[in-house]
Amino acid sequence: WSAGKQFTQRIAYSTDGGETLHKIDKSVLPTVCKENRDPKVFWHEKSGAYIMTLWLEENDFGIFRSTDLLKWEQTDRLTFKEAWECPDLVCLKDEKGNETWMFWSADGFYFWGEFDGYQFQTDGVRHAAYINKIAYAAQTYSNTGNRVISVPWLRFPNRGRNYTGAM
């Protein structure tokens, strides 16, 4: 269904608490790379902007920012060896309110660093959250206070069923 088509990033919004969604008919972000996909958008209070992480190609990811969700500017391009797809950028706070940021990729690799609303600075040391390849493409919820809630897709065959894996 997507063969030969460019990947685009689009927006749907709700004015009634999510009961109905209204789609914006055009792409809000020009195609950066042929198959760029898997956007994750969150509000970054300190810089007063929405932030989007996006898989670009191979081991490359982009960070974009917008104040209105319609016009986006790329502010960073990151390359992490052996990491790909489904990026997430998460702020973790300790008991004293000190922040550290974690950049996450689909395969459970993550990188510690600092984020200023424009760029993610890291030492590049890759950490692995999983000991096997069952969990994949975890994403976190926004607006959960100081809690970080992450839900992965658990990839395993369900023979005789019309689905694969579980969330």
Task: Identify the meaning behind each predicted range.
Residues W1-M167:
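Carbohydrate-active catalytic/glycan-binding domains of CAZyme proteins
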